[in-house]
Amino acid sequence: MSASFLPSILTPVVTLVFPGLMFALFFVLIEQEEIA
């Protein structure tokens, strides 16, 4: 089982999902501040 293709799949996933999670978390915190 060769894992040579893994970085090419992992890189776009990390670069898209990780900032998306950070932005979603930041958005939720702002929304909670506005509601409260």
UniProtKB/Swiss-Prot annotation:
The chain crosses the membrane at residues 9-29. The keyword Mitochondrion does not apply. Keywords: Chloroplast, Membrane, Photosynthesis, Photosystem I, Plastid, Thylakoid, Transmembrane, Transmembrane helix. It is a single-pass membrane protein. One of its GO terms (cellular component) is chloroplast thylakoid membrane. It is found in: Plastid, Chloroplast thylakoid membrane. The keyword Nucleotidyltransferase does not apply. It comes from the Eukaryota. Disulfide bonds: none annotated. May help in the organization of the PsaL subunit. Belongs to the PsaI family. This is Photosystem I reaction center subunit VIII. It comes from Emiliania huxleyi. The gene is psaI.
